[in-house]
Amino acid sequence: ASPSTPQLGVGRVSMRKTASKTVSSGSPWYGPDRVKYLGPFSGEPPSYLTGEFPGDYGWDTAGLSADPETFAKNRELEVIHSRWAMLGALGCVFPELLARNGVKFGEASWFKAGSQIFSEGGLDYLGNQSLIHAQSILAIWATQVILMGAVEGYRIAGGPLGEVTDPIYPGGSFDPLALADDPEAFAELKVKEIKNGRLAMFSMFGFFVQAIVTGKGPLENLADHLAEPVNNNAWAYATNFVPGK
């Protein structure tokens, strides 16, 4: 008999958890003696945070990881968002860096670049008319939905043949450099990825706040701060919103 949809869902969660388990002996990032969020001053972690997965510092005051299925889903969401945040942070900084070094490709500020599609000439990807010349925001939106939907569907379904057992770390053709061949090295890379991903998500949040408050990109804000650190810093900008000022 064929399994029901709920059974398939439970099986998929269990499979992901099993496939994502890390075998790492003596690592400071895994197991009961792993590094905790407050170091030696950390309290006893919840019983369900055993140090089995990368990035587990024993901190979950809201109990978000208490349910195994919710924990598995949240872990997947965190890793995927971390990867997009790392790409996004690089995409926010790199155009500004190029522009500051004399490369001309249109608007360098990440939050202003997209608005060029509403201009009369439209938007040239990388400032090059021979690449993609976009003139319709609806067409771009539809294309993004189709492309991203196809990629996510491919990942979640396990590839065309369903041979990928772990959508978070698929391996195979997704690992052309064979970085996952050594289990110990792979376990450490998972920790590095999630740590840098969390920093990238905070960075993206900071970029959004900077854009709203200063109307400038991250490198321009950094240059302003280095030039006048007393007048250009988070505290100085925050006090501008104090009532009566």
Swiss-Prot record:
* Annotated binding of chlorophyll b 4, by residue: 144, 155
Task: Specify which residues bind chlorophyll a 3 according to the UniProt entry for this protein.
Answer: 116, 126, 193
| PTM sites of type Phosphothreonine | 18
Topology in membrane? Multi-pass membrane protein
Q: Which of this chain's residues are annotated to bind chlorophyll a 1?
A: 59, 65, 78, 198
Residues that hold chlorophyll a 2 according to the record: 81
| Residues bearing PTM N2-acetylarginine | 16
Q: Does the keyword Plastid apply?
A: yes
Per UniProt, where does chlorophyll a 6 bind?
225, 234
Q: Where is this region: Disordered?
A: 1-28
GO cellular component terms? chloroplast thylakoid membrane; photosystem I; photosystem II
Alphabetically list the UniProt keywords.
Acetylation, Chlorophyll, Chloroplast, Chromophore, Magnesium, Membrane, Metal-binding, Phosphoprotein, Photosynthesis, Photosystem I, Photosystem II, Plastid, Thylakoid, Transit peptide, Transmembrane, Transmembrane helix
Q: Which InterPro entries match?
A: Chloro_AB-bd_pln (IPR001344), Chloroa_b-bind (IPR022796)
Compartmental location? Plastid, Chloroplast thylakoid membrane
Annotated chlorophyll b 3 binding sites: 136, 152
**Which is a Pfam family this sequence falls into?**
Chloroa_b-bind
Q: Where does chlorophyll b 5 bind?
A: 144, 241
* Residue interval of the organelle targeting sequence: 1-15
List residues binding chlorophyll a 5.
Answer: 192, 210
Gene Ontology MF term list: chlorophyll binding; metal ion binding
Q: Where does chlorophyll b 2 bind?
A: 83, 132, 161
Q: What is its main location?
A: plastid
> Domain text from the record?
The N-terminus of the protein extends into the stroma where it is involved with adhesion of granal membranes and post-translational modifications; both are believed to mediate the distribution of excitation energy between photosystems I and II.
Record's function text: The light-harvesting complex (LHC) functions as a light receptor, it captures and delivers excitation energy to photosystems with which it is closely associated.
Q: What is this protein called?
A: Chlorophyll a-b binding protein, chloroplastic
